[in-house]
Amino acid sequence: MAAPRISFSPSDILFGVLDRLFKDNATGKVLASRVAVVILLFIMAIVWYRGDSFFEYYKQSKYETYSEIIEKERTARFESVALEQLQIVHISSEADFSAVYSFRPKNLNYFVDIIAYEGKLPSTISEKSLGGYPVDKTMDEYTVHLNGRHYYSNSKFAFLPTKKPTPEINYMYSCPYFNLDNIYAGTITMYWYRNDHISNDRLESICAQAARILGRAK
């Protein structure tokens, strides 16, 4: 006749270990060392039971942290490149006001920010409200840029962060830049308060060169 099979539950094992450790009513350092053993056993049990989950969580958190660091570094580098290129554009074009616009969220383009500017701000724009302006994707400037073409106008200024007319602007010229995903990501724009400006052929050359560099940094 086979002997009856005896099984132990995890709780039986746990209480058995605790009974062995604390049955002699030890105090002081002995008790502290035994408590440390219990804590260590508890941690080991959790790791053994949920080891895969903890490891996956650790990998995910490390990846997210790494991605955030990379994104911050990329953003800082892009802003530095944008300011550098804008200074070249502003001086070369002899514009009165120049700006680099950047769309967000990435590849969705719901809002536009001025991330760098040179020259005198138009009277309708406040330095405190250069970001978060909604993008109207039906505007001529946006649709022209989507096709990779440059845009110029003496009356329509799609991305200026204001709903008020800006009569002091007599002319604007802009070109798009595309990010590494080849998605329209923003514009480089020059404005003139006076009637005279250099030729569009020259502006096209100035703007296109800066747009290529910004695209590689974005």
UniProtKB/Swiss-Prot annotation:
Cell location: Host cell inner membrane
Residue ranges, Cytoplasmic side: 1-34
Record annotation: effect of changing residue 175 to S: Complete loss of lysis
Disulfide linkage: 175-207
Protein family according to the UniProt entry: Belongs to the T4likevirus holin family.
Segments passing through the bilayer: 35-49
Keywords: Cytolysis, Disulfide bond, Host cell inner membrane, Host cell lysis by virus, Host cell membrane, Host membrane, Membrane, Signal-anchor, Transmembrane, Transmembrane helix, Viral release from host cell
Membrane topology label: Single-pass type II membrane protein
Spans within the Periplasmic topological domain: 50-218
Name by which UniProt lists this protein: Holin
Originating organism: Enterobacteria phage T4 (Bacteriophage T4)
InterPro entries: Phage_T4_GpT_holin
Keyword check for 4Fe-4S: no
